[in-house]
Amino acid sequence: NKVPYNIYGGTQDDATVYGPADEWNNSFNEKWKYLWIDAWDGGDGCITRVDPNDNNTVYFSLQNGALRRKNMLSGISVSIKPKLPMIINDNLNYNFITPYFISNHDSNTLYHAGNYVFKSTDRGDSWKLISNNLINSSDKPSFSAGALAESKLEKGLLYYGSDRGSFWVSKNDGISWEERSEKIGNGYIRSIEPSKFNKSVVYMSMTGINYDDLNSYLYVSDNYGKNWKKLQGNLPNEPINFIREDENFEDILYAGLYRGLYVSLDRGKSWNILGKNLPMSSVSDMEVHKSTNDMIISTHGRGIYKFNLNPLHKYYLKQENISDELLFSDMEMVLPRFNDTHKEPLMDTYQKVPISFKLNSKKNY
């Protein structure tokens, strides 16, 4: 809820960083900081989650299942990586990037997955095992989890995807799991997106790049994964890192590919590239800051980018004839900032003001 809000991102060999959602400007001191860093080799940053009810509680993961909770006021972090109960004589496997998340229904509840799925209701202080060894697929034996998700519409509706294409669903918060992997590929399931509008709909993407397969694999199911339909449409045939559903409109989907970000306004029937000045690099992840409607995306090697979704939403409404006129929001004026010398204001403020206008096509300008 800060203004500007903070963006968190994991890097390769340079730990995890965070900073304000402002455009970078070299007239000011660098505002980005390390959330953590290994003093010897930097370390690899993976997934960062912020408690939605407490900005001072931040979770961050390192490679191979390591997970920590940090108090931003004290600067102290503690390890909260789950362990198998002593009575289970088995190995706990993790991929380099381990899926975990804060429940949409309770900010004290966490889920964390390797070849087993764990649940905590006390912010990671203790964990409960809520699955069997899910890599023991009937025909897709795997090593560990690639993706884990919970429905925003139904508490305890969980989805699990492995690194070899096995897909599991639990409708009772892990009490029982059912495999639903038929007629999908054998790739690394990187992204599972339960619909925000229909609880039986779930999207899933997988990549074969780990196995020298550069094809695209994108699916949708309208019955909790029992049956799958391919959703590639006219997307380039290249690895897909994630699939996301828009926060406000169920027809709008976003896909992060090996070379670029794509958007669909018709639920995957057709796709267009999004962001004309975005480098053609691998788009690895995406989040939406709800109060500003900003999309934040991460790339591999080309940094973090921010894109406001309001113009896209207005275009979609106009295309669907939902609104007769485009309504543009009022401009928010921002005072110039003083630079670090405190002698003169920086008139070309980096807090840009969007200007929207409409031209009458019947006239010449």
Predicted regions and their residues:
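Beta-propeller blade termini and top-face loops
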Residues: 1-325, 330-333
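Contiguous beta-strand segments within globular domains
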Residues: 337-364
